[in-house]
Amino acid sequence: MIILKRLLQDKGAVIALGIIVLYVFLGLAAPLVTFYDPNHIDTANKFAGISFQHLLGTDHLGRDILTRLIYAIRPSLLYVFVALFVSVLIGSILGFLSGYFQGFVDALIMRACDVMLAFPSYVVTLALIALFGMGAENIIMAFILTRWAWFCRVIRTSVMQYTASDHVRFAKTIGMNDMKIIHKHIMPLTLADIAIISSSSMCSMILQISGFSFLGLGVKAPTAEWGMMLNEARKVMFTHPEMMFAPGIAIVIIVMAFNFLSDALQIAIDPRISSKDKLRSVKKGVVQS
């Protein structure tokens, strides 16, 4: 509750959280908040300018850009949420087991992580695309295969730190069950760390799925996706540059929102890292080490 209170006191964090909630709402309620079919082709109305009928105009096939922009939230953001959730779940389970029990279990899980982290995520993604073809599903699978190992390593380090604390040692001494110790004494302490690395990972995952779609290796046409929309706009960027603005700005805004949220979470958990707090302390004549 203290962390949440600090987070809500940060105006930047509140704005970032509001933007993320708005994006998620628009993505889930896309059929309810739009008036057009995102894939409806109207060549007689292509490259239409901004108007009351089309607030952001139309593309080279006469499709409403705003409608496609909203529908693109689903593969660009909501699919990434699913991949992130599965990656964090797998990484957390293995990270807790590795960091708490250590020994043979730790060595076995860490060697598996070494194998997975030996291959760059882009290489794994390209390999899956070569084997199974293009599609968001293969990119999401690649995210899960590469990200779980990274989450596992980070969470393992955090768990090992808390496992060595006095209250956990005391719980072991009195014979408390291992699973109960993890659930009651370690898991609540690591949730904040998991939230920070999850929010920061969202940025790179959104950029990656948009990047692959921009290269024509991600979401298949005619499905609306920000990277795909940028790819389509690239072909007419000199004659109709406005087509690139909407998906580009949408990506920039959501990535900045997750970056701000990640920074705010770190400050909420440990206020000492805030330069503003340090400046106030110096002004008061208090030197913090």
Swiss-Prot record:
Gene3D superfamilies the record matches: MetI-like
Membrane topology: Multi-pass membrane protein
Described purpose of this protein according to its UniProt entry: Part of the ABC transporter complex CntABCDF (Opp1) involved in the uptake of metal in complex with the metallophore staphylopine (StP). May be involved in the import of a large array of divalent metals ions such as nickel, cobalt, zinc, copper and iron. Probably responsible for the translocation of the substrate across the membrane.
Primary gene name: cntC
PROSITE patterns listed in its UniProt record: ABC_TM1
PANTHER family recorded: D,D-DIPEPTIDE TRANSPORT SYSTEM PERMEASE PROTEIN DDPC-RELATED, OLIGOPEPTIDE TRANSPORT SYSTEM PERMEASE PROTEIN APPC
Transmembrane segment boundaries: 13-33, 77-97, 115-135, 194-214, 249-269
Membership in a protein family: Belongs to the binding-protein-dependent transport system permease family.
Every ABC transmembrane type-1 domain range: 73-262
One Gene Ontology cellular component annotation held by this UniProt entry: plasma membrane
Family matches, as InterPro entries: BP-dependent_transpt_permease, MetI-like, MetI-like_sf, OppC_N, Staphylopine_ABC_permease
Source organism (scientific name): Staphylococcus aureus (strain Mu50 / ATCC 700699)
Name used for this protein in its record: Metal-staphylopine import system permease protein CntC
Protein location: Cell membrane
Assembly notes: The complex is composed of two ATP-binding proteins (CntD and CntF), two transmembrane proteins (CntB and CntC) and a solute-binding protein (CntA).
Pfam family, one: OppC_N
Keyword annotations of the record: Cell membrane, Cobalt, Cobalt transport, Copper, Copper transport, Ion transport, Iron, Iron transport, Membrane, Nickel, Nickel transport, Transmembrane, Transmembrane helix, Transport, Zinc, Zinc transport
Induction or repression: Up-regulated in metal-poor media.
